[in-house]
From Swiss-Prot:
Recorded GO MF terms: rRNA binding; structural constituent of ribosome
SUPFAM superfamilies: Nucleic acid-binding proteins (SSF50249)
Originating species: Tetradesmus obliquus
NCBIfam families xref list: rpsL_bact
Signal peptide (UniProt feature, chain positions): none
Protein name: Small ribosomal subunit protein uS12c
Main location: plastid
Family: Belongs to the universal ribosomal protein uS12 family.
Length: 130
């Protein structure tokens, strides 16, 4: 326990909270350009080929972002919107690409959780009629 004199000499330091998505610079999303689209394998108990992209953001950062959903149309030089959110079994992947915006198409034939994968209601109705 410090004395009053010690507290006068130097006040208590505020503990600063470390951000989980520093590349977004306190923004909800950031635009970026795909530099490389590839697959990576997850950590130990899981097995898959997860689709990821290396993205250069408008904030100047270069990050690895996960491409959610089944199938995608992303290639090099595609303009994408990146949000925060890590992938637990991929070390170093702390961002997600937003589906259905800019150059990223929504997931085909998606009926449930459509808003998370950029699918409009009209698209699902058209697929149901066929």
């Amino acid at each position: 326990m410090p004395t009053i004199q010690q507290l006068i000499r130097s006040a208590r330091k505020k503990v600063s909270k470390k951000t989980k998505a520093p590349a977004l610079k306190s923004c909800a999303q950031r635009r970026g350009i795909c530099l490389r689209v590839y697959t990576v394998t997850p950590k130990k108990p899981n097995s898959a080929l997860r689709k990821v992209a290396r993205v250069r953001l408008t904030s100047g950062f270069e990050v690895t972002a996960y491409i959610p959903g089944i199938g995608h149309n992303l290639q090099e030089h595609a303009v994408v919107l990146v949000r925060g959110g890590r992938v637990k079994d991929l070390p170093g992947v702390r961002y997600h690409i937003v589906r259905g915006t800019l150059d990223t198409a929504g997931v085909k034939n998606r009926v449930q959780s459509r808003s998370k994968y950029g699918v409009k209601l009209a698209a699902t109705k058209a697929a149901a009629k066929k």
